[in-house]
């Protein structure tokens, strides 16, 4: 089932949860709604499900206006963060519940229900737990049972509201890989809400980044990470360094002067004729680093702290011309080979930068990093 959200607005008192949001979700696609708490992603999910009503705008399901359609008529399966399993029912009865409460004319026979539940438990690889009760299961097992229960009624749309948020990191990683494989088998149009950037980038076909009730960017995981459309997206998806400077137009293109260093601005960046001050965004792994030598090109820094985190060394550097901190990530082998020591003077050179106008870049990136 395809879904179209057209100019949807939702307010709670004076708070605008969704502000004229328009989106299109293609049939059979797994889409992540990503953003900080309060950005409107869960509200949007609930409006699509029919659990909330928009103050303005339209929801189209397969091209038909479903704005006034009851939740039971939308053929939606919903999975919440906190399982919502019935503790007094076995795993089997929990999965069968949606089938048993259907109107008599639509209710399958007992034999059909048993066959359907058995097939679903095999699909989620938990058929051996059919006679157990929810308190006897792990968190990951309970969430898979909740998903099987949602699938039992054969929804045309599957909505997941932070389904792995209550689980520990290792179980979450295992379950999101499992969800991706399950989706590839079923091809049900699926939307899942998350504030976990890694989860969204790993699982989804498409990512919708939201902030303050509006859509910042829609695209593939690769597109939103490598070509962020706004400073907020850049700051929310992973760590980022900000280099404030003065723009200058030249024959070979624009240049951003950061202290005594000139950084080339990639084509398509901020127009130097329209903006004087700008900010360059650079990710920690996109910075070259070497020991300082007279005449060396780059931004002089002092190594303040080095942390080794598995296969990566995280360096905290302080610019010598200001108190600004620069973060650099290096493969652990390169860090050890260079033999860098705390207190040493070094030079950094950004390899890949994205430039935004001064006010736009600083304000939105700071908000994104605080939210992340």
From Swiss-Prot:
SMART domains: AAA (SM00382). It catalyses: sulfate(out) + ATP + H2O = sulfate(in) + ADP + phosphate + H(+); thiosulfate(out) + ATP + H2O = thiosulfate(in) + ADP + phosphate + H(+). GO terms for molecular function: ABC-type sulfate transporter activity; ABC-type thiosulfate transporter activity; ATP binding; ATP hydrolysis activity. Coiled coil: none annotated. Its main location: membrane. ATP binds at residues 35-42. It holds the Pfam family TOBE_3. Residues 3-237 form the ABC transporter domain. GO terms for cellular component: ATP-binding cassette (ABC) transporter complex. Keywords: ATP-binding, Cell inner membrane, Cell membrane, Membrane, Nucleotide-binding, Sulfate transport, Translocase, Transport. It comes from the Bacteria. The keyword Oxidoreductase does not apply. Its EC number is 7.3.2.3. It is a peripheral membrane protein. It is found in: Cell inner membrane. It is an enzyme of class 7 (translocase). Part of the ABC transporter complex CysAWTP involved in sulfate/thiosulfate import. Responsible for energy coupling to the transport system. The complex is composed of two ATP-binding proteins (CysA), two transmembrane proteins (CysT and CysW) and a solute-binding protein (CysP). Belongs to the ABC transporter superfamily. Sulfate/tungstate importer (TC 3.A.1.6) family. This is Sulfate/thiosulfate import ATP-binding protein CysA. It comes from Ralstonia nicotianae (strain ATCC BAA-1114 / GMI1000) (Ralstonia solanacearum).
């Amino acid at each position: 089932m395809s879904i179209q959200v057209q100019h949807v607005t939702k307010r709670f008192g004076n708070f605008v949860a969704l502000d004229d949001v328009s989106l299109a979700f293609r049939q059979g696609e797994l889409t992540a709604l990503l953003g900080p708490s309060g950005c409107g992603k869960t509200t949007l999910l609930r409006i699509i499900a029919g659990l909330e009503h928009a103050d303005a705008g339209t929801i189209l399901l397969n091209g038909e206006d479903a704005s006034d359609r009851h939740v039971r008529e939308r053929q939606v399966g919903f999975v919440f963060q906190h399982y919502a399993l019935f503790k007094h029912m076995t795993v089997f009865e929990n999965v069968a519940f949606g089938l048993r409460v259907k109107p008599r004319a639509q209710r399958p026979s007992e034999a059909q229900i048993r066959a359907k539940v058995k097939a679903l438990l095999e699909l989620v690889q938990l058929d051996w737990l059919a006679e157990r009760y929810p308190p006897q299961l792990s968190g990951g097992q309970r969430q898979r049972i909740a998903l099987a229960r949602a699938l039992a009624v054969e929804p045309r749309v599957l909505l997941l509201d932070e389904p792995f948020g209550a689980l520990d990191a290792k179980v979450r990683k295992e379950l999101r890989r499992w969800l991706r494989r399950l989706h590839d088998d079923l091809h049900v149009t699926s939307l899942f809400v998350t504030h976990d950037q890694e989860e969204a980038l790993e699982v989804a076909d498409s990512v919708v980044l939201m902030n303050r009730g509006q859509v910042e960017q829609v695209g593939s995981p690769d597109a939103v990470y490598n070509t962020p459309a706004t400073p907020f997206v850049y700051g929310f998806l992973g760590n980022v360094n900000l280099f404030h400077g003065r723009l200058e137009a030249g024959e070979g293109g624009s240049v951003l002067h950061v202290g005594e260093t000139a950084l080339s601005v990639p084509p398509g960046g901020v127009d130097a004729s329209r903006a004087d001050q700008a900010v360059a965004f650079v990710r920690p792994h996109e910075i070259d680093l070497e020991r300082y030598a007279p005449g060396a090109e780059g931004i002089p820094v002092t190594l303040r702290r080095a942390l080794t985190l598995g296969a990566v060394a995280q360096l905290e550097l302080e610019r010598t011309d200001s108190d600004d901190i620069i973060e650099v990530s290096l493969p652990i082998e390169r860090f050890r080979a260079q033999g860098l020591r705390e207190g040493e003077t070094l030079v950094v050179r950004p390899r890949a930068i994205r430039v935004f106008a001064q006010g736009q870049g600083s304000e939105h990136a700071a908000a994104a990093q605080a939210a992340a």
